[in-house]
A protein has these predicted regions:
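Conserved phosphate-binding/catalytic region of the ribokinase-like
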Residues: 182-267
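Ribokinase/PfkB-type carbohydrate-kinase core domain
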Residues: 1-5, 60-63, 68-73, 86-210, ...
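Active-site catalytic pocket residues across diverse enzymes, especially alpha/beta-hydrolases
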Residues: 38, 142, 238
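Active-site metal-binding loops of divalent metal-dependent hydrolases
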Residues: 9-10, 229
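Glycine/charged-rich beta-loop-alpha catalytic/anionic-binding loops adjacent to active sites
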Residues: 10-17, 65, 209-218
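Substrate-binding N-lobe of the ribokinase-like
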Residues: 3-4, 15-82, 88-89
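Short helix-capping/linker segments at secondary-structure and domain boundaries
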Residues: 38-42, 91, 241-243, 267
């Protein structure tokens, strides 16, 4: 059994055009997809408020095998929210005021959370997570693997300083950034995965390149949570079999399914 912890963002995704509100956020999207895999125990560490959005987060994973014992429910707190806009092709975009961090922005790990991290096999988070440095500091006392999503960051000089602590590196982009990761894979003992939207994905490990095509969909409904679902499937597959190519194929299939509906997962 692989013990995976997903951190920390849980929020309400508000789809502006339709007015629909769904639970989302990287930690929640990841956990809801990872829990589909056998031999995986997935839990979430993070904070929500005791408001309607927080209750929607909890409702979204009712009945799913996700451990919620480390979700902090802040009395009188405001759950994070994100206002999402969609193009005619289903690609999401945001306005400057789309994001409201709520209690997620002020969350800090408890001692119980730190113990849970140290007892895990894999910790998944984004590079923007407030608990990032806290989690990295725990690697000295435990052997968990750290998986980090760098989204669309391009400050590669700063990013490289973080690589000694990272085991799985995820980023979204285009083929022009691939040489960076090919070079890094020869220098750092890390698996570097680059998702390329409709052009599939590429992974570098120890200088070797692995490529995988995207799984086509008849219609792209919404790209929200696509990366999270890919990362969840990739990590769960790799933890089970240690095969990069299979993990990429699994990630592509999961992302394709996510493209077919509104929101990062169905509930």
């Amino acid at each position: 059994m692989t013990n995976i912890i997903s951190m920390t963002t849980m929020c309400a995704d508000v789809f502006v055009e339709s007015g629909k509100m769904l639970a989302g956020g990287e930690a929640l999207n990841f956990a809801a997809n990872a829990c589909k895999f056998p031999d995986v125990k997935v839990s979430i560490i993070g904070a929500i408020g005791d408001d309607d959005c927080g209750r929607e987060v909890l409702r979204s994973i009712e009945g799913k095998p996700v451990d919620i014992s480390d979700i902090h429910i802040i009395k009188g707190g405001k759950t994070a929210s994100n206002h999402i806009y969609l193009t005619e092709k289903g690609d999401r975009y945001f306005m400057e005021n789309s994001w409201d961090g709520g209690v997620d922005e002020t969350f800090s790990m408890s001692e119980s959370d730190r113990k849970a991290v140290c007892g895990s096999d894999i910790v998944y988070m984004t590079c923007y997570c407030n608990s990032y440095k806290d989690v990295v500091s725990l690697k000295d006392r435990s052997d968990f693997k750290l998986a980090v999503d760098f989204d669309v960051r391009r400050d590669f000089d700063e990013i490289e300083k973080l690589l000694p602590d990272i085991d799985f590196f995820f980023i979204s982009g285009s083929e022009d950034i691939l040489p960076v990761f090919e070079k890094w894979s020869e220098k750092y003992d890390c698996i570097f995965n680059v998702t390329l939207a409709e052009n599939g994905s590429v992974t570098y490990h120890k200088g070797r390149k692995h490529s995988c095509k995207a799984v086509p969909v008849s219609e792209v409904i919404d790209t929200t949570g696509c990366g999270d679902s890919y990362h969840a499937a990739f990590l769960c597959s790799y933890a089970a079999e240690g095969d990069i190519q299979k993990a990429m194929a699994c990630g592509s299939a999961s992302a394709s399914e996510t493209l077919s509906h509104i929101g990062g997962f169905e509930y």
